[in-house]
Design a protein with these regions (language model features):
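Metal-centered catalytic cores of metalloenzymes
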Residues: 2, 19-84, 88-149
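Sec-dependent bacterial lipoprotein signal peptides
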Residues: 1-19
Length: 149
């Protein structure tokens, strides 16, 4: 048996193993979850409840993996943010904090290892979570966006 004939079964097994690893739920590609639901967001003052007159804006995305892990961030312009959170609440409703975001300059990110509980996972999938950025002038939030996967 030649070396090439001996190598073919080994190469085939390695290729099959790689395919299985790539298809596993919750695997990551480039730091993002390869399965789950993603919500892209555009934050404005008009989305706040009550609405806020501001020129500040923000954008970003959040991804929920099938195991409840959540990742994502928003980047803002025109606001001196003091805090940002993912909150529970349908459009036009205010609610409690589900996840606090960490600030780095004008970017607010979900902390590593953050997970949503089952109720918050269902709320995410139903569009009943929102992200907002608070400021000294608008303690309840200056800009907001609904998470709509």
């Amino acid at each position: 048996m030649t070396l090439v004939k001996k190598a073919i079964p080994v190469i085939a097994l390695v290729a099959l193993a790689a395919c299985q690893t790539m298809s596993d739920a919750g695997s990551t590609v480039g730091g993002w979850f390869s399965s789950g639901k993603t919500a892209n967001v555009k934050l404005t003052g008009a989305e706040q409840n009550p609405p806020v007159a501001t020129s500040a804006t923000g954008s970003g995305s959040f991804t929920l993996a099938t195991d409840g892990a959540v990742k994502g961030s928003v980047t803002t312009t025109g606001v001196q943010g003091t805090a940002a959170h993912i909150h529970r609440g349908a459009k036009g409703q205010n609610g409690g904090v589900a996840v606090g975001l960490t600030k780095n300059g004008d970017t607010y990110s979900v902390p590593d290892g953050a997970k949503l509980n089952e109720a918050d996972q269902a709320a995410f999938k139903a569009g009943n979570l929102y992200v907002n950025v608070h400021s000294a002038a608008n303690k309840g939030g200056e800009i907001r966006a609904q998470l709509l996967p």
